[in-house]
């Protein structure tokens, strides 16, 4: 089945900030423990949902509307694969949230500065890939429509799937 978007870091960061505001105490032990689990989870996403290794993600997850025009987790009848704008956006957000957590942990443990830099760099790779998949000039963004679309790859050809939904916002 479809996987749900990687919102773990966003949720942990929100819980941490709300608790800190409510109690006046920064419980970084919680943040650090969950951060290490999310490092493993992030690696799973990169290894399983970026099968082409180009920082554009696929694999069926939606999250906002959860209703696709077709089953994005099943093999396509035409072969090929779909580069998903929503999945790629979710992973960009995951990077930014992990970076924020690493920066918070770096306040007392400078070793996390390098980890924060890693997530900033990965975010930049994702942003670049959305505008130039694998350096081939293929974009998820459509300048004319001012909208992000999924891209269907079959063999050496590609085409934007111009179906407007929450996916492209």
Please give the residue ranges for each predicted region.
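Membrane-interface helix-loop-helix modules in multi-pass inner-membrane proteins
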Residues: 2-3, 54
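Well-ordered alpha-helical segments within folded domains of soluble proteins
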Residues: 3-14, 88-103, 164-169
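Active-site acid/base region of carbohydrate-active enzymes
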Residues: 19-93, 106-157
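Polar, glycine-rich mid-to-C-terminal structural blocks
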Residues: 152-153, 157, 161-165, 169
